[in-house]
Amino acid sequence: MALTTISPHDAQELIARGAKLIDIRDADEYLREHIPEADLAPLSVLEQSGLPAKLRHEQIIFHCQAGKRTSNNADKLAAIAAPAEIFLLEDGIDGWKKAGLPVAVNKSQPLPLMRQVQIAAGGLILIGVVLGYTVNSGFFLLSGFVGAGLLFAGISGFCGMARLLDKMPWNQRA
């Protein structure tokens, strides 16, 4: 089912007329940065619990970070929100910001966990390669180990590095 994609400015007009804006990103992404009018309903929660019945007769605009998550899950979102009139925000919150519309940013919140994993994994791989060339070839094993961990995470859905980073003090929420 093809859902209508709308521009940020069109979405803002619909919101002003009572449409509900639903952010399907994870809580850590939302807490760091979100559109002020958006309500958080992560895709994983929507899949389990569905949409509240009171919203099923509203206009609903779903959004994510860049629009990919909403477009990839358009059929699921349509089924979850039926019979509501459903729209997808073009380019997600990134498009909203590019259009010059306001976002609420909380820099005291940590970066989203997956970004932390990408930074840590990329840094460890780079360190392993640089040290492997300059100090001792044994350091290449570090890069191989991190690469194997990422491969395992992709296949199994379990990311040990994400679990470890989630336990770090800066990721502990009060």
From Swiss-Prot:
Which CDD domains does the record associate with it?
A: RHOD_YgaP
According to its record, what are the GO cellular component terms? plasma membrane
The protein's enzyme class = transferase
* Keyword Membrane found: yes
Q: Which residues form the active site?
A: 64 (cysteine persulfide intermediate)
* Intervals, Cytoplasmic compartment: 1-115, 159-174
Consequence the record notes for mutating residue 64 to D: Unable to bind sulfur. Cannot be S-nitrosylated
In terms of superkingdom, the source organism counts as Bacteria
Topology, Periplasmic side:
141-143
Domain Rhodanese residues, every copy: 15-105
Q: Give the GO molecular function terms.
A: thiosulfate-cyanide sulfurtransferase activity
Identify the InterPro entries for this entry.
Answer: Rhodanese-like_dom, Rhodanese-like_dom_sf, YgaP-like_TM
Reply yes or no: does the keyword Cell membrane apply.
yes
Domain annotation text?
The catalytic reaction induces conformational changes within the rhodanese domain, as well as in the transmembrane alpha-helices.
What protein is this chain from? Thiosulfate sulfurtransferase YgaP
Its source organism is: Escherichia coli (strain K12)
Q: Which gene name belongs to this protein? A: ygaP
